[in-house]
């Protein structure tokens, strides 16, 4: 009974034995070889293929046949015919060359009159090391601790530490002179908006004038804006005037006051496009062709009658 566990242990060790491995770097040449156990039989053919289903070559006598886009420039077969060892050399290794390579022997007995062929195969694993593996190992072996983030709002900002201060855009200060009682507010903005559409283009130019408000003069400057819209039917120009006093109130008060339009005028100008001229030209050409056709038909009928009349008079 003790022999059975020993036998099972030996079988498990045999099947657990990994394939022979060959480790190379990218760009190097790798030589793979395997020996056959049956040295008495006659080798009919040897083969190399890469798992799972890629045939590299078949060798019979001095003939070597390559498959699956493999060539002798990439893989050279260095084994003499009917040798105990079969060898291939893979040149200029790439990452795609890594994998399990299998060599196979097809043998027959010289004294056997039957066509029985024995088969032996052996596997070798090729490992291609890339330069990126060491870099990945260094990155993975480093610290994976990420800095903690807080969503709490700080109570104050220390201006002495420049690295922790954010640049905040603030409006220009308003100058208030107590003696003169003069408030000066200056607005400067240029806005050009262009809108492109299938029917045409729209362009808006707005340039508000500076506003100066004094207690003594209380001068208010109106803002005039022109809007030009070009469409397929024509060009529409709109002129609007806005009282800047509302803008002054909006700046000084917390409540927002909408802008007021004092007056507006609209002018429409018709415009002809190339399509209209094409239609007119087509209609004119059609009329001319119709007139020519009518003339030709009339001429043909009259000429035919004239010939018929002359023929009858001759008879």
Swiss-Prot record:
Disulfide pairings: 34-103
Database matches in PROSITE patterns: IG_LIKE
- Keywords, ordered alphabetically: Disulfide bond, Early protein, Glycoprotein, Hemagglutinin, Host membrane, Immunoglobulin domain, Late protein, Membrane, Signal, Transmembrane, Transmembrane helix, Viral envelope protein, Virion
Provide the Ig-like V-type domain boundaries. Answer: 17-121
Stated role: Prevents cell to cell fusion by interacting with and directing the viral OPG040 protein on the host plasma membrane. The OPG185-OPG040 complex associates with components of the entry fusion complex (EFC) presumably to avoid superinfection and syncytium formation. Via its interaction with C3/VCP protein, protects the infected cell and probably also the extracellular enveloped virus from complement attack.
Q: Which residues lie on this side of the membrane: Intravirion?
A: 304-315
Bilayer topology: Single-pass type I membrane protein
Where on this protein are sugars attached? 37, 69, 112, 161, 254
Signal peptide (UniProt feature, chain positions) = 1-16
Q: Which family does it belong to?
A: Belongs to the orthopoxvirus OPG185 family.
What InterPro entries does the entry give? Ig-like_dom (IPR007110), Ig-like_dom_sf (IPR036179), Ig-like_fold (IPR013783), Ig_sub (IPR003599), Ig_V-set (IPR013106)
Quaternary context: Heterodimerizes with OPG040. The heterodimer OPG185-OPG040 interacts with components of the entry fusion complex OPG143 and OPG094. Heterodimer with C3/VPC protein; disulfide-linked.
* Annotated protein name in UniProt: Protein OPG185
What inducers act on this gene?
Expressed in the early phase of the viral replicative cycle.
Regions crossing the membrane: 280-303
Chain ranges on the Virion surface side, renumbered to this chain: 17-279
Annotated Gene Ontology cellular component terms: host cell membrane; membrane; viral envelope; virion membrane
Q: Mind telling me how this protein is modified after translation?
A: Glycosylated; contains phosphate and sulfate-substituted glycans. O-glycosylation is required for hemagglutination and hemadsorption activities of infected cell membranes.
Record keyword Mitochondrion present? no
List locations, semicolon-separated.
Answer: Virion membrane; Host membrane
SMART domains linked to this entry: IG (SM00409)
Which residues does the annotated region (Disordered) include? 194-213
Q: Does the keyword Glycoprotein apply?
A: yes
Superkingdom per UniProt? Viruses
């Amino acid at each position: 009974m003790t022999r059975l566990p020993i036998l099972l242990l030996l079988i498990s060790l045999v099947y657990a034995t990994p394939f022979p491995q060959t480790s190379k770097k990218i760009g190097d040449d790798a030589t793979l070889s395997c020996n056959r156990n049956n040295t008495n039989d006659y080798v009919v053919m040897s083969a190399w293929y890469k798992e799972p289903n890629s045939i590299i070559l078949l060798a019979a006598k001095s003939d070597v046949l390559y498959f699956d886009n493999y060539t002798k420039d990439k893989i050279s077969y260095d084994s003499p015919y009917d040798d105990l060892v079969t060898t291939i050399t893979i040149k200029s290794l790439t990452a795609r060359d890594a994998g399990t390579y299998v060599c196979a022997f097809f043998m027959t007995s010289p004294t056997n009159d039957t066509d029985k062929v024995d088969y032996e195969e052996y596997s070798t694993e090729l490992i291609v090391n890339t330069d990126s593996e060491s870099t990945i190992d260094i990155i993975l072996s480093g610290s994976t601790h990420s800095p903690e983030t807080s969503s709490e709002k700080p109570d104050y900002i220390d201006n002495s530490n420049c690295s922790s201060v954010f640049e905040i855009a603030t409006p220009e200060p308003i100058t208030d002179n107590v003696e003169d009682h003069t408030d000066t507010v200056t607005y400067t903005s240029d806005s050009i908006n262009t809108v492109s559409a299938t029917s045409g283009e729209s362009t808006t130019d707005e340039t508000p004038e500076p506003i100066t408000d004094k207690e003594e003069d209380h001068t208010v400057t109106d803002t005039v804006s022109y809007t030009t819209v070009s469409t397929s039917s024509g060009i529409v120009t709109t002129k609007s005037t806005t009282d800047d006093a509302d803008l002054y109130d909006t700046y000084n008060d917390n409540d927002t006051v909408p802008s007021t339009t004092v007056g507006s005028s609209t002018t429409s100008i018709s415009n002809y496009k190339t399509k209209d001229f094409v239609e007119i030209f087509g209609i004119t050409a059609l009329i001319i062709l119709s007139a020519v056709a009518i003339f030709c038909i009339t001429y043909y009928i009259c000429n035919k009658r004239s010939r018929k009349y002359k023929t009858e008079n001759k008879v």
